[in-house]
């Protein structure tokens, strides 16, 4: 932390472009909410919230799910069941590496298709959990971790770029904050509550401290949800790809 703080003093200065007098709404960044008047921006923020729900699902239940196999005799001694933290760490590695793929995909396919790829990746993320196991099917868990990088990076980066391209410079910072609010704020909160209800319906904590139950049904529901979101996004969100704008 101290090293990063020291490093920040070496960064170049950035001018702050702001009007001399701002209203209270502008000062608080609330002026970005006027973007909801635009159908395209409103749809984008709604889908951002829905994707934020998916993120919270995987953050909250990936590790308890993998660890739950320790409560099953046939998987109790498998490498996967006993190394949930190691398996989930592949998600962070994938997240870091997938950043490198984004410039190519954005230029080749455009913002909408990259967002759609991220949504399909969420379907695979949850679906692979539903059909995999820590024994012979552990490769499905590993593949799910790899897919996570695409699911997380592709939407967050392309979404931030979309906000930058489609909003006025005077409210870009507020608009980016609204994007984060919809994904990591409202979306994450709703996702926590909704996912909790689903898991509680199909699973229970046993005497050994493992969350056991019908996880296959849980992940099928989550995958179906992600698929519905992807289909609706493909149908209703309209955005033309202009490679020359991405290049700039």
PLM feature segments, named:
Residues 1-18, 232-237:
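C-terminal membrane-cytosol helix-exit motif in multi-pass small-molecule transporters
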Residues 60-84:
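Short amphipathic helix-loop junctions that connect adjacent transmembrane helices
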Residues 120-134:
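C-terminal ends and interior cores of transmembrane alpha-helices
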Residues 197-226:
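A membrane-interface helix-boundary motif in multi-pass transporters
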Residues 12-45, 71-72:
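Juxtamembrane intracellular "pre-TM" segments in multi-pass secondary transporters
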Residues 97-111, 199-200:
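Helix-to-loop junctions at the C-terminal end of transmembrane segments
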Residues 154-168:
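Intracellular juxtamembrane helix-capping segments at the cytosolic ends
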Residues 37-58, 146-147:
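Pair of pore-lining "gating" transmembrane helices in MFS-fold secondary transporters
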């Amino acid at each position: 932390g101290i090293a990063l703080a020291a490093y920040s003093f070496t960064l170049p200065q950035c001018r702050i472009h702001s009007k001399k007098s701002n209203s209270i709404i502008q000062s608080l960044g609330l002026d970005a909410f006027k973007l909801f008047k635009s159908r395209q921006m409103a749809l984008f923020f709604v889908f951002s919230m829905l994707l934020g729900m998916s993120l919270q699902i995987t953050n909250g239940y990936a590790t308890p799910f993998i660890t739950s196999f320790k409560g099953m005799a046939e998987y109790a001694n498998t490498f996967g069941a006993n190394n949930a933290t190691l398996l989930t760490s592949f998600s962070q590695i994938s997240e870091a590496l997938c950043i490198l793929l984004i410039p190519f995909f954005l230029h080749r396919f455009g913002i909408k298709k990259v967002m759609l790829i991220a949504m399909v990746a969420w379907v695979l993320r949850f679906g692979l959990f539903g059909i995999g196991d820590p024994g012979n099917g552990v490769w499905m868990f590993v593949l799910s971790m790899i897919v996570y990088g695409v699911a997380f990076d592709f939407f967050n980066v392309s979404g931030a770029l979309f906000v930058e391209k489609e909003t006025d410079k005077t409210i870009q910072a507020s608009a980016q904050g609204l994007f984060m609010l919809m994904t990591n704020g409202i979306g994450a909160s709703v996702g926590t509550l909704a996912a909790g209800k689903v898991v509680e319906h199909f699973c229970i904590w046993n005497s050994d401290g493992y969350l056991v139950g019908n996880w296959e049904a849980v992940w099928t529901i989550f995958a179906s949800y992600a698929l519905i979101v992807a289909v609706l996004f493909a149908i209703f969100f309209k955005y033309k790809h202009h490679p020359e704008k991405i290049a700039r």
